[in-house]
From Swiss-Prot:
Superkingdom classification of source: Bacteria
Protein's UniProt name: Trigger factor
Protein's cellular compartments: Cytoplasm
Family statement: Belongs to the FKBP-type PPIase family. Tig subfamily.
Amino acid sequence: MEVNVVENGLFDRDITITVAAEKVDALLSQEMTKTAAQVRLPGFRAGKVPTKMIEQRFGASIRAEVAEQLFRDSYPTALMEKGLRPVGQPELDLVELEKGKPFTYTAKIQIFPVIEPKDYTGMSLTKPVVTIQDSDVETVITRVREANAEYRTQEGVAAASGDRMTFDFEGFVDGEAFEGGKAEDYVLELGSNRFIPGFEDQLIGAKGGDALEVKVTFPEDYHGTQLAGKEAIFKCVVKAIESRELPEVDEELAKKAGVQEGGVEAMKQEIHERLVKEADKVAKQEMKQQVFKLLLENNPNELPSQMVDHEIEQMVATAKEEYSRQGVDPEQLGFTDETWRNQYAEKAKERIILGLLMGSIVSKENLEIDDQAVEAHIDALVQQFAAGDYAEQLKAQLKKDKARLEEFRGAALEEKTVAWLIEQGTVTEEEKSFEELVAQRG
């Protein structure tokens, strides 16, 4: 077998493979004999059909089968011989196979990039340091009160921020109603910013029974391209205003927050402990993002187009599934194939490069994890969704799932690698409030 490789740029390779005529003839003869033994034709005993007739009736399919077999045998061998690692499947340029002649074909491939990480030790990093304050705890308690608030209908009272309004509305652009711009008995908490900027502000002060027009401009980056940047008028009819009444901070509220014993003080203590854990988690995530950002800045790399295209397809598929779960059709929001690609192209490149860099660092620095590290990641997930006997069942189920187990192993190895990179860096502590830390994450 002869193998010739032509480089067409950084990643593109044309591999021309020639299989000797002797092997071609041997396989043709073997396949012909096999077909003759199996075929049944009227007037001939089994295995006695003339070779010429076999050739006339089945020659094309036999040659196609032999060509396929020759490719399956020779292509992996050629890759191994030349030390090539292809991205995806090859694009084949096949010539028709003929008896007595060598079989030659060309496989067009893209090869995996070889990334040699640099400047990954000694990175300058900032570690957020947060001390949980009483005010942070009170903020959470306020949210608990808001979540357990009761609403009472108010007659003749002007709506204020925090009130709940029930109203009908219909939107118009250039005098024409648009799809998705109409609703009846819609319930909205004023000040929640669920609508486009300026909409809710114009509802404040309205009373039950009022009819009013709300004038807004859709943002330039609004997800429905037919509405982006356009002025709209919403005709609204207010049906009811309900004011919010917050419950007292007492033992009953503590129970609603999941603290069955110890009352208000126990609730505050539990909230404090939870915020400490949350701050630690967010701080670690923040440092991880710093590490990733610096790795990308220090290691710019080109990538094969097939690799990027595949990653974009995976990311788009995941996004579409998420929209589907929410009952949203992305096409109705103006998403096109080009929109999807533009949205994920850069993220896809970064994800691939980071994966290659991290893998290379793991290999160079001989970083390893044990089963306990994997188990810790499984436990962390199980604790979020289950307790008691069901938690044990879920854990056992996850450990039997090879694909999920590999995901946990990958997450554990990534965590260890990031921790190692942080240890090799220069870390400066920076005091932050809990609010600042969380806002930075968002």
